[in-house]
Amino acid sequence: MIPNADADEKRPSFIRTFLGSSYGNTSDFGCWGSLSPDALYDVQSRVIGRICHAGPCVIVGRTADYIARELTNLFSVFIHSPEAHRARRIVMRNDAADEAEAIRIAKKADSKRESYYNYYTGRRWGAASNYHLSLDASMLSMEETVDLIISFLKARAAKM
């Protein structure tokens, strides 16, 4: 079964918006209504590649770590956290009425992300070996997590 192309993120329209605003005519990529999940992934991969080659950028999800794997300046991060922590954050964002619903939402999203990532990369989603840094978001505040990632990037850049 081919995973749904939007399984990786909630807002798959980014690629369409980017193509429309950045490239004007999207006819090079075919008619949107006729794109299969594999064709959409191919378009997405080309767009991500162009963005990565244009200069520093941050791309969340979309198998960007795999798409940009040949770039020497790539830095990939996987952020995870225990189910209870994720459920509380989902409820705090008002995306679920209670923690039980939030856990169902998180599990469904993870299942889709895992299927999508594994299918298109041949790798195992979430495996620490696929990323330069893997962090448990429940261990630090969001600000501390950001600071840690920035510190890691600065230390890495100093060695390059």
What spans do the regions from the language model cover?
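ATP-dependent NMP and nucleoside kinases share a basic, alpha-helical "lid"
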Residues: 43-95
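Short gly/ser/thr-rich secondary-structure transition/capping motifs
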Residues: 38-42, 57-61, 114-119
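Small-molecule kinase domains that catalyze NTP-dependent phosphoryl transfer to phosphate-bearing small molecules
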Residues: 2-24, 98-143
